[in-house]
Amino acid sequence: MPDTTARILALRAAGTSLVVELAEPVPRVLHWGADLGDLPESALAALALTGEPAVLNNSIDIPRRFTVWPTEADGWSGTPAHQGHLAGASTAPRLSLAGTSYQAQDEGGELSLRLTEPGAGLDVTVTYRLEPSGVLAVQSRITRHEDADPAPYDLAQVATLLPLPRRAQEILDFTGKWSRERSPQRRPLGFGTYARQVRRGKPGLDSPYLVTVGVPGFGFAAGEVWGVHIAWSGDQQYLVEQLPEGAGAHAAVLGGGELLRVGEIRLAPGESYTTPVCHFAWSGQGLDGLAERFHTLLRDRPNHPRSPRPVILNSWEAVYFDHDLDRLLRLADKAAEVGVERFVLDDGWFRGRRSDNAGLGDWTVDPVVWPEGLTPLVDHVRSLGMEFGLWVEPEMVNLDSDLAREHPDWVLGSSRGAGPSSRNQYVLDLANPQAWDYLLEALNAVVDKYGIGYLKWDHNRELHEAVHGPGDRPVAHAQVLALYRLIDALKERHPGLEIESCASGGGRVDLGILARTDRVWASDCIDPVERQSIQRWTTQLLPPELMGAHVGSATSHTTDRVTSDTFRLITALFGHAGIEQDLTRCTPEELARLTAWTALHRELRPLLHGGRTVRADLGGDATLLHGVVSQDRTSAVYCWARVATSPEGQYGRVPLPGLAAEATYQVRVRTELGLPSLHQTSGPGWLAPALDGWLTLPGAVLTIAGLPMPNLNPEQALLLEVRRTEGASGA
């Protein structure tokens, strides 16, 4: 990309913009947020002039500027862009601009800034790439000069930071646990630092996921919001920071990066460290607007799944470790009968794996359980017209395995002995080249022998004491990079191989792993009450086609809650759909309902996996309305769900978000999956005609005024379909 002589540079796309001034010694961010338009040089100069803050009492004697790489040299007292030292020295970096490359496009572009720090012998390159979706991808690279002091530079922290305005005063992020991932939490932004640190070796079940700051009371449909997601599958940190003196002309900062373990990154001359990509996005239309940006970003990727997402049956909740060929053949027969398109054999197929106490690491088919190998099952599944997939957990190892007995040094952990196990397992040291080579060849052999087209890739134990080698050197960073290389190498050998990211359910859901996998398992919990919330918030970052959403048996295997098949089936429609139950024990009525469900999913799949996700602001958690609207707003499907009781009798009119107010639509209730139980004597006036067929209504009535919704009993759902009538305008 060419260098530029301009002093103020802008990137613009999809209603958002970034403006940077090439100030000396370090450039500063003048604006990130709503698009300022195609500003002439005079207007850009005015933006720079008005971006100069006041000099405060009892403060430094020059205006504080918030730079692209904030340090104490700028008078910045907040979290610095980086911290490190040379044997306890060179701890106060002073950077200066050494080069710029800039390429603006009609929608987006890229700005790269090279900074130099002679004291520690560092070059820092910060690259801003504004995608056509309006998502701003920021990545930095720190390199030691070839002729630098031979002592290693210990890099302790790198944080990517962008400014926030004063009106951004409320924080939304996430927490969770096993079977309850991505639980939202809100708090006001006060003075100081709000930091979320993850030290699990993966984002974790309590992952911050997507940290959003917005105007007070922002919701799904309204309110200005700014968000960041760190595309990294290991330790990470997010922060929102507001100092009394502000951040230059701005009020606060938002950002984060990889959380580096002490002594993990030591740069010798010529060596580099590259940060994960931090994805920033702004929306003036609330959380749905923010989600749309990320969904567009992901769908625009060259490696985004293009073929229809096949309906899956996963064997885990059907048979667990009881791998019996005849039983699995019968299960496959039933799966094909109800319309399943991909059959996945879960945990229990490999050597010594009769429980979770043993076998992990020995990735060959158990000859006792499978005397003829997997071939009889694989061939039968394919003869029924289904694809065949397999569960693996390559990064984990049981001490009761041939692999651990033969190579105890391949187990990641302290030289003073293994720490506590998790589900009876430990982590394999992927930074060990021999262990990495073994895994690649073992996985390749299984995939190659059986023509496996799909792997469910699990990961359970956290990376506690992620050290190896003499002196117990930290390798959490190297472990993630080795994982990425392993998946990339396996996919290179097997073009078309699809991989699902699973980590005790939804413990590794990030755009780093999704750069090389094809979907995520949102949670081990498929109880529809829990899944309504889990899926609602997983789609804040991911489009539905990347999120596994399965229907299970009436009694949930994780909560023991009993729910209706109608509620379970409607909930599982809104993702990459699948089944987790023993179909050989289903009644004919249950099988008929599942058959109708798979047919309905195939009918709605182009809409569900290509439309815009919308969610209604209802002011409480007892009832939920969410849906998917086609990009041209000609069709939509909505779920109206009640997950708990509430004092409300009438809900008032509930707008169906995303439709064109000026158009005319038809509405009907889809009844193939059954009808919900109602907590009322009779339904609202529109419900009966919508149950009988298509009811024609103006778009303004549907999306502005709204429909009075039926009062459902708890743990019930209603499915609405909407289509625009011929000849109606309103694109």
Describe the residue ranges of each PLM region.
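Glycan-recognition surfaces
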Residues: 383, 398-437, 480-584
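Aromatic-lined carbohydrate-binding/catalytic grooves of carbohydrate-active enzymes
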Residues: 306-441, 454
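Short Pro-Gly-centered flexible turn/kink motifs
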Residues: 95, 265-284, 715-722
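Glycine-rich, aromatic-flanked loop segments that form ligand/cofactor-binding clefts
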Residues: 63-96, 220-236, 280-303, 340-347, ...
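C-terminal beta-sandwich/jelly-roll accessory domains of carbohydrate-active enzymes
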Residues: 645-731
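Polysaccharide-binding surfaces and accessory modules of carbohydrate-active proteins
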Residues: 7-10, 18, 27-244, 664-682
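Carbohydrate-binding surface patches
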Residues: 15, 210, 222, 618-661
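Conserved, mostly hydrophobic/aromatic
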Residues: 15, 140, 270, 313, ...
